[in-house]
């Protein structure tokens, strides 16, 4: 740090009032150091009064010179003390100026860090938007799979109805066959001796017919069992989906909550830095006001004060820009929160559809066995076994257990319930 040159104030020497020119030639002068000079006497001797007066004036001159030297020394010491105090004040001001500059640099770094964090948050928003688009596409594919699943369910229901109708037809044929068997039994009682061989053949045919009937009943029972398993799988699918949605929502909210807490903490740190900076600036401003009178006497310090004032104005503008930046970041934070809420809702919907699609794929892997071949048979011997009573079809929603009157109503309700 270069030292500021000081201009010493001129100190005027006290000049004693001298006598006439002839007296100055007679008496000698004393220098500023107080050394007496040779006294030159004229060739002619003066009166005693004149000599006495010259001695008195010489003594007065010496006293005046001594007083002038003493005042000059005091002035010099005072000037040195003043220069030392001014130098200390200058060093103090330069130290404060360096501290303010370091504070400005630190705030600039914090500003760059906040800008980087904002860019990172924008990148995360873009990534979430991309995920949302992907989930929308997955949602469309899942809807298509649900539609195909409902078509398969309707097809299996149609097959079950066809099997039920075939079973009813078989039971009708069995009843007709039973009537014929009773008639043959009456004839057998009359013609037992004559048609023993035919009776044995008819008995064999009756046994084969009973076996075919048992196979048909087993096939119908298997169809009912598969339908019940499909309904249970649907119910379990939606229960697992609800559990998965709850766990995913809790984890997503926890992660977003941590990110929001980090952003709020960063904003609070920025506010505290701005408050501390304002306090430092106010303190420096008060100190500048206190030293304003002294700085007016020193041109170099005045120029430095002008530079400091310009830096202060720049600092104020930077503080205002930081305040505007803070408001902008607050608005962006609120916008990100709204975007997060919207994306969270979309993610929940997409996760629900994705989980349902996975469950549908797992459930739809075991294919339904083909319907058993219907064996044609001829009337045979009577049978004592009767078929169990027919069970009505159960059109039940696997999610809310809604009982539908028919298959079309169930299909419409399942689509609405899933959406």
Swiss-Prot record:
Residues 1-197 are annotated as: Required for interaction with and ubiquitination by MARCHF2. Residues 242-350 are annotated as: Ubiquitin-binding (UBAN). Residues 150-257 are annotated as: Interaction with TANK. Residues 246-365 are annotated as: Self-association. The modification Phosphoserine is found at residues 31, 43, 68, 85, 376, 387. Residues 251-419 are annotated as: Required for interaction with TNFAIP3. Residues 44-111 are annotated as: Interaction with CHUK/IKBKB. GO terms for biological process: DNA damage response; positive regulation of canonical NF-kappaB signal transduction; positive regulation of NF-kappaB transcription factor activity; positive regulation of T cell receptor signaling pathway. This is NF-kappa-B essential modulator. The lineage of its organism: Eukaryota, Metazoa, Chordata, Craniata, Vertebrata.
């Amino acid at each position: 740090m270069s030292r500021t040159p000081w201009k010493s104030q001129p100190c005027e020497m006290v000049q004693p009032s001298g006598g006439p020119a002839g007296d100055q030639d007679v008496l000698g002068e004393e220098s500023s150091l107080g050394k007496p000079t040779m006294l030159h006497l004229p060739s002619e001797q003066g009166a005693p009064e004149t000599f006495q007066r010259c001695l008195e004036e010489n003594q007065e001159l010496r006293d005046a010179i001594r007083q002038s030297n003493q005042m000059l020394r005091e002035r010099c010491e005072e000037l040195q003390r003043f220069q030392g105090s001014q130098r200390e004040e200058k060093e103090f001001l330069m130290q404060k100026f360096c501290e303010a500059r370091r504070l400005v640099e630190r705030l600039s770094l914090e500003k760059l860090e906040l800008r980087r964090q904002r860019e990172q948050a924008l990148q995360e928003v873009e990534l979430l938007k991309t995920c949302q688009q992907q989930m929308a596409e997955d949602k469309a594919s899942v809807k298509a799979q649900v539609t195909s699943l409902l078509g398969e369910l309707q097809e299996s229901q149609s097959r079950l109805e066809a099997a039920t109708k075939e079973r009813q037809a078989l039971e009708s044929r069995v009843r007709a066959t039973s009537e014929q068997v009773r008639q043959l039994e009456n004839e057998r009682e009359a013609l037992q001796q004559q048609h023993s061989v035919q009776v044995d053949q008819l008995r064999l045919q009756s046994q084969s017919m009973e076996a075919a009937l048992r196979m048909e009943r087993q096939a119908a029972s298997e169809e009912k069992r598969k339908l019940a398993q499909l309904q249970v799988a649907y119910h379990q699918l939606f229960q697992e989906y609800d559990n998965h949605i709850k766990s995913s929502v809790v984890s997503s909210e926890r992660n977003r909550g941590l990110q929001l807490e980090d952003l709020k903490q960063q904003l609070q740190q920025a506010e505290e830095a701005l408050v501390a900076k304002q306090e430092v600036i106010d303190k420096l401003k008060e100190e500048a006001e206190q030293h304003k009178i002294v700085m007016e006497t020193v041109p170099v310090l005045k120029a430095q004060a002008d530079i400091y004032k310009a830096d202060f104005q720049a600092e104020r503008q930077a503080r205002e820009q930081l305040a505007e930046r803070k408001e902008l970041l607050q608005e962006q934070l609120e916008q990100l929160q709204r975007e997060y809420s919207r994306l969270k809702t979309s993610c929940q919907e997409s996760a629900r559809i994705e989980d349902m699609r996975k469950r549908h794929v797992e459930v739809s892997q075991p294919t339904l066995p083909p319907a058993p071949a219907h064996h044609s048979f001829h009337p045979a011997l009577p049978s004592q076994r009767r078929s169990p009573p027919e069970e009505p079809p159960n059109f039940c929603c696997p999610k809310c257990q809604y009982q539908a009157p028919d298959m079309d109503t169930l299909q419409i309700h399942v689509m609405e319930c899933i959406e």
